[in-house]
């Protein structure tokens, strides 16, 4: 949402360049985040992630695109929260809000399925 004085509120329309930049920053943060989580993750946290994966999978089978987009983004927030770094969690949440808008604009169902499969691979690697 973009607020413009004397004009009102508008939905932000990210450019292709902004989309690339957002995903580049996410890649850097999420790669390091996953590396740091790997040696300290608990069985309980793995179970929590597996439950989230089941919810993602269910969301892919219905037509609620916004809901599935939110769940796919939430996966990364769950990982960040597990590290206990509130600054990282907040920064990632802000990036995910931007990338979710991009996903709503451009992500196909096939691409969403591939994202969910990547999440499964991440949890498998963490386990």
Model regions and ranges:
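Mg2+-dependent prenyl diphosphate-binding active-site environment of isoprenoid biosynthetic enzymes
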Residues: 30
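Beta-hairpin "wing" of winged helix-turn-helix
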Residues: 1-6, 10-13
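Helix-turn-helix-type domain boundary/helix-start signal
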Residues: 9-12, 39, 81
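Active-site loop of classical SDR/Rossmann-like NAD(P)-dependent oxidoreductases
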Residues: 111-113
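Conserved amphipathic alpha-helical segments that form helical-bundle/coiled-coil interaction surfaces
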Residues: 18, 22, 26, 34, ...
């Amino acid at each position: 949402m973009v607020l413009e004085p004397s004009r009102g509120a508008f939905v932000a329309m990210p450019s292709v360049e902004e989309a690339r930049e957002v995903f580049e920053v996410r890649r850097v943060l999420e790669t390091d985040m996953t590396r740091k989580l790997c040696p300290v993750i608990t069985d309980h946290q793995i179970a929590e992630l597996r439950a989230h994966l089941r919810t993602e999978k269910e969301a892919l089978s219905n037509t609620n695109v916004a809901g599935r987009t939110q769940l796919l983004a939430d996966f990364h927030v769950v990982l960040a929260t597990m590290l206990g770094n509130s600054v990282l969690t907040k920064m990632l949440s802000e990036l995910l809000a931007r990338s979710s808008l991009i996903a709503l604009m451009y992500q196909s169902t096939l691409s969403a399925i591939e994202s969910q499969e990547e999440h499964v691979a991440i949890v498998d690697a963490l386990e």
